[in-house]
Amino acid sequence: MTDDIGNRPCEISWFSALCDDDYEFLGQPDPMLQSSWEHCRNIVLTAQKGGFDNILLPSGYQLGMDTTIFAAAIAPYVDRMRLLWAVRVGEDWPPQLARRIATLDRILGGRLAVNIISSDLPGQSLESEPRYARTVEAMKILKTMLSGEHLSHKGEFYDLEIDPPRMKTMSGKCPPLYFGGLSPAAREAAAEAADVYLMWPDTMDKVRDVVADMRARAAKRGRKLKFGYRAHVIVRETEDEARAYAAR
């Protein structure tokens, strides 16, 4: 993934298993690896020591730890690596979220990125298309307020006339917004307001098609996207050992 903030052409990231998603065997939960402060903190610190550029702090309502609390707690331990903080926008009021983003970015010295999740409010359910439309409104509100601009927004989901919070990010702008989703509504949302479009493992031809499609959608809006790719990696001393482990 191309990184605008640093001089490296590619950002190499890891993730901390806040959603009880640290498995020895993919998709098979292990009670010994459930999320806890100690376990997830150690993942973050090991990733930083190993030279990773960024680390995802995922978020889910039912599983694991609260991502906002964990991000604030781990931030003082992180002195080089960026945090990719997952935010469930269906659970947040955008002006208050803008203030939290600015505060956490300050604590991190400007090393914050935000993974936008188009979530429901727990206990409620919204159809996919309006949920993504609400997410687009939220992303645009965040970008306006975190750029220090007065917000005058009248949308389907938010009707706001408000000044930005006094707390500013280190850059005076909104941190990069990462966003993933393959449905047409999700792709439109990413093209409209995200900065980095996240993808999942697939064949090279299919990934190439997705990238071309997303570039075209963004270009229609006079925008450009960067791209991220998530993959599960099995590392051993030799390729034969890695393949043998993968076949278990």
Language-model segments: residues:
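N-terminal beta1-alpha1-beta2 module of alpha/beta enzyme domains
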Residues: 1-78, 154, 172-175
